[in-house]
């Protein structure tokens, strides 16, 4: 991310040191997936993550063996985390509202947009209005 001067990056739990990433990225946007874990979220906050992501909430072709998360982690985060909360994993236009109601501020919908056999990307995005 720093080599191409990206606005920031998103890291998985096995992508390297959070502290090292923050030092490299300085004031750039930096988020981390915390699966279904309060402990991982707390650690990410201590390491100055810009946002905290939880998931996978639903089955996804992208990461078929992803750790499953439930809505309780979003409810906990809404009460306890001051950073933006992102929901990830198998999200589509029929299941996203329950994630928002539970506490997600943002949703990651890459597979629904880019791997949708029925809709072109622009039309897929419009399904969320």
Language-model region placement:
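Short, well-ordered coil/turn segments that N-cap beta-strands
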Residues: 5-7, 26-28, 48-50, 81-85, ...
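Ampipathic, surface-exposed secondary-structure segments
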Residues: 42-81
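Glycine-rich phosphate-binding active-site loops on the catalytic face of alpha/beta enzymes
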Residues: 13-20, 53-65, 96-129
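Alpha/beta enzyme core
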Residues: 3-7, 38-55, 97-102
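Hydrophobic faces of well-ordered beta-strands that scaffold small-molecule active sites
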Residues: 9-11, 30-33, 52-54, 85-89, ...
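Alpha-helix-loop-beta-strand connector modules within alpha/beta enzyme cores
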Residues: 15, 19-37, 65-93, 126-129
């Amino acid at each position: 991310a720093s080599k191409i001067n990206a606005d920031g990056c998103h890291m998985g739990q096995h992508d390297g040191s959070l502290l090292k990433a923050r030092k490299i990225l300085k004031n750039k946007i930096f988020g981390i997936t915390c699966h279904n874990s309060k402990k991982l979220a707390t650690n990410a906050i201590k390491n100055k993550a810009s946002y905290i992501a939880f998931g996978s909430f639903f089955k996804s072709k992208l990461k078929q063996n992803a750790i499953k998360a439930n809505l309780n982690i979003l409810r906990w985060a809404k009460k306890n985390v001051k950073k933006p909360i992102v929901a990830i994993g198998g999200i589509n236009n029929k299941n996203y509202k329950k994630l928002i109601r539970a506490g997600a501020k943002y949703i990651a919908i890459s597979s629904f947009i880019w791997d949708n056999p029925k809709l072109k990307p622009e039309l897929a995005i419009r399904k969320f209005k």
